[in-house]
Amino acid sequence: MLNLIKLPQVFTINQVPKVFHEDGIISGYRHPCSSAKDCVLSLFQLTNETLNIWTHFLPTWFFLWKLLTVVLVLEDWRDPFIWPFLVFLLSCCVYPLASSCAHTFSTMSERARHICFFFDYGALSFYSLGSAIIYSSYSFPDKWVNGTFHLNYVSIAVVNSIISTALACYSRLGLPFLEYNCHSIKRPSGKLDQKLCKCLRIIAFVYPYLFDNIPLFYRIFVCAGEGCTVNEANTVHYQHTSLAFFTGFLFATHLPERLAPGSFDYIGHSHQLFHVFAIIGTYFQMTAIELDMAARKQWLHAHLPPVTFLNTVGAAFFSVVSGLCIVYVFSLSLFSTRGVKNKSF
């Protein structure tokens, strides 16, 4: 039966439009006007996207299992103390799923490619907010709890998640309707402009990460003496922080494929490694939070401001709705009332 299934053809970099090109990747490209069926079939053949997809699709199910375990098996969801952790676990399910879907269906057309990654950026911004919510609830150093920064921390993180989504979407094509529309779907052509777009995208995600981790950086790198929250979670926080910086390095540098173009087209290029280390880092982050929750539960119950629906689920809901509105606006200008057919390949 499997022999009757014809897998889609793959192409080299010179055979696909420039918008589909990746630095240092020479071969393994899928048809730039693939059908949805071809995109799904490509999961089962080796292309330069195959491992990008599976390295995020499979972990999605692990985080979903973890979420369902807390909700259905342990039934801890009734305790408000657990709500921030549930929001975080939901974000851990959403961002790898959005990423794997974006990489799967991004070759249906140029327009589909942009829209897929708009959603991907929104999901990453939601994950950054999920991280802020759990840090606020479980990982702030003792001496900062109930301080001005702590009381405003989640609100600022919500704003950051919205700015992050907007800036990341802007980095692809510019301002919708003003700088691009359905008749002009292209990235800036100059090398300087392309580098600026890359820098903007990096800033869009590095800035929220750095802000989210201010309390954690202070706790594990700076703080000394009483009120610094020293426990077994600190070692794991060191580990996931190190993995996060390495993940960012891979995303920014496109190593190793830039050193040997064509040698890592299918296995071992930076985006695959970026996915792998991002997931491992997220796992260590989750583990560190669980250790903080167990070790500090009594102290946090006594000193932490009340955990409410508004500052957990409400904050996440507002961020998600805002992100979807941003994605809608950036996607809307890629369409016209009459519709625009994809250019033939």
Swiss-Prot record:
Single biological process term from Gene Ontology: oogenesis
Superkingdom of source: Eukaryota
Protein's job: Steroid membrane receptor. Binds progesterone. May be involved in oocyte maturation.
Main location: membrane
Compartments (UniProt record): Membrane
GO molecular function: signaling receptor activity; steroid binding
Keyword annotations of the record: Developmental protein, Differentiation, Lipid-binding, Membrane, Oogenesis, Receptor, Steroid-binding, Transmembrane, Transmembrane helix
Protein known as: Membrane progestin receptor gamma-A
Record has Transmembrane as a keyword: yes
Pfam family of the protein (one): HlyIII
Name of the coding gene: paqr5a
Residue ranges that the UniProt entry lists as topological domain Cytoplasmic: 1-52, 102-114, 170-201, 294-314
Extracellular membrane side: 74-80, 136-148, 223-272, 336-345
Family named by the database record: Belongs to the ADIPOR family.
Listed transmembrane segments: 53-73, 81-101, 115-135, 149-169, 202-222, 273-293, 315-335
Record's bilayer topology term: Multi-pass membrane protein
GO cellular component, one term: membrane
